[in-house]
Structure formats: structure tokens, C-alpha cells
């Protein structure tokens, strides 16, 4: 089964009413001790005078920082609704066919600075926390999550091809190693104009969302990086290169 890794969006969509988070109902419950340590520390930081500086946000996001304080009681929403923005708009979970949604629920994993890893059906409250954050008493979040995620995700991957649509900030928290790396494919997006290639961040997020949607809608399960390249190549110009322990699939868009 193909596994697709996504980053969270910065913005989150919440609800005014609803049940609060039930930690035991979340995927990867073995991550709960780390989740609670991170979120309780986040709540303390968010209630302090240093909140904006530690979290790297401005006063205009004060309402989002305030929600961090009440993470245990805020209404929880499915990850499929929680995350928004360019990548998730392109993915378009709400408009997937029933079969594609079932595949999304089992194949999509969001790597999160607050929750470690989530599936689409996991219900959590909105939060404001980047994986690039260093929390007092815990340290850099990518380091905090590295060992717990390795234990959980290494087991979850099995023999799957791993399609990595994360940014480098979130990839730092977990990178497949050893034999798992042989099926780890990071998706890169470049724009080619007049023979010159460049990376456009907004465009790259959009295309990664489209790639994830295409994989879900295809109903196919490429068993190797080369089979993945062939499948993506039906829709885009795609180049596959071995990069270190894993692979990079470069999607080339032409102007």
C-alpha cells in the first residue's frame, strides 16, 4: 500500500462546538506521552509573555495562540477538515470519490509538530505550532519527535512505497532509513521556462497536492519507485533520481 506523507498547513479550520480530543482514539496511541508533553508545554508557552517570540508569530495571530492554551477542551475536528491552504485545496479531500476517500484515510499521513502523525480521520483541535519551533524544556521539535516517530512509522510503513510531499522542516522529524529508504521517494517540483528550472514554493505545494490526489484517484498501488514514476508520468513530466539513501521524483512543469 502506497503511503503518502503530508506536512500540516499553517492555518487550521476549527469548529465552534463539538467534542474535545480523545487521545486514545487517535492513530498511533503510543505517541500519546510525547503528544501530551509537547501540548502541555505549548499551553504554558502560549500563556506566557514570550509566546509570540517562541512560536515565531505576530500579535495578529493572538487568537490562534490562545487556542493552544485550551487544547484539551477545544472542539476537535477531523484532520481532513482541520488542514487547509494551497496543498490541501489541491488535494480536495471533500470532493474525492468514496473509494478515493477510503484510500486517503488509510494512505495519507500528516506529520505534525503537535501530534507527531495523524490520519485523515483523527479528530484534534486547531493549534499553532511549527516543527521548526524549540520549546523550553523540550528542545527542537524535530528532535523531540525523531525517536517516537521512528518507532511508530517504521512499523507502519511495512513494504510500502513512501511518497513524501513534506517540506524539509517536517522531513527532519522522520526520514526512512536502512531498507525503508529504498522505497522512500521525496516529491520535488520545478518550473521550467526557457530551459531554466526554478522552484516556486506556492506552486510546489499546489502540485504536491495534485500529485497526492492523482495517486488516490488512480486506485493503483505502485510497488517500486520506478512504478511510481511511471504512474505520475501519465499526468506530468516526472524524473526519478537516486539521492542518498532514498529517491527524488522531480515533477517538471513547463510554462
Language model segments and positions:
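Generic preference for well-ordered secondary structure
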Residues: 22, 26, 67, 71-75, ...
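Generic signal for short, ordered secondary-structure residues
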Residues: 17, 67-70, 90, 190, ...
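Generic hydrophobic, helix-prone segments enriched in Leu/Val/Ile
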Residues: 37-42, 64-65, 228, 232
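N-terminal "assembly arms/tails" that initiate or stabilize quaternary assembly
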Residues: 1-61
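A glycine-rich, hydrophobic loop/mini-helix early in the fold
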Residues: 51-126
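A broad, low-specificity signal marking well-ordered, structured residues that form hydrophobic/aromatic
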Residues: 4, 86, 185
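Internal, well-folded beta-alpha domain core
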Residues: 93-255
Amino acid at each position: 500500500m502506497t503511503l503518502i506523507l503530508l506536512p500540516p498547513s499553517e492555518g487550521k479550520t476549527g469548529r465552534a462546538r463539538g467534542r474535545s480530543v480523545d487521545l486514545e482514539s487517535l492513530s498511533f496511541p503510543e505517541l500519546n506521552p510525547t503528544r501530551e508533553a509537547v501540548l502541555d508545554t505549548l499551553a504554558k508557552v502560549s500563556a506566557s509573555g514570550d509566546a509570540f517570540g517562541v512560536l515565531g508569530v505576530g500579535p495578529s495571530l493572538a487568537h490562534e495562540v490562545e487556542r493552544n492554551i485550551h487544547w484539551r477542551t477545544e472542539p476537535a475536528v477531523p484532520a481532513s477538515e482541520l488542514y487547509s491552504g494551497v496543498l490541501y485545496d489541491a488535494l480536495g479531500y471533500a470532493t474525492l470519490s468514496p473509494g478515493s476517500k477510503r484510500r486517503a484515510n488509510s494512505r495519507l499521513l500528516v506529520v505534525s509538530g503537535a501530534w507527531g502523525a495523524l490520519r485523515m480521520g483523527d479528530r484534534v483541535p486547531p493549534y499553532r505550532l511549527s516543527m521548526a519551533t524549540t520549546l523550553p524544556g523540550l528542545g527542537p521539535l524535530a528532535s523531540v519527535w525523531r525517536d517516537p516517530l521512528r518507532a511508530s512509522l517504521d512499523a507502519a510503513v511495512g513494504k510500502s512505497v513512501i511518497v513524501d510531499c513534506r517540506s524539509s522542516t517536517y522531513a527532519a522529524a522522520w526520514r526512512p532509513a536502512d531498507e525503508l529508504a529504498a522505497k522512500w521517494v521525496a516529491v520535488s517540483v520545478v518550473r521550467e521556462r526557457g530551459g531554466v528550472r526554478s522552484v516556486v514554493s506556492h506552486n510546489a505545494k499546489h502540485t504536491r497536492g495534485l500529485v497526492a490526489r492523482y495517486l488516490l484517484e488512480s486506485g493503483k498501488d505502485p510497488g517500486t519507485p520506478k512504478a511510481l514514476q511511471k504512474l505520475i508520468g501519465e499526468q506530468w513530466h516526472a524524473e526519478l533520481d537516486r539521492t542518498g539513501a532514498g529517491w527524488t521524483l522531480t515533477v517538471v512543469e513547463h510554462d
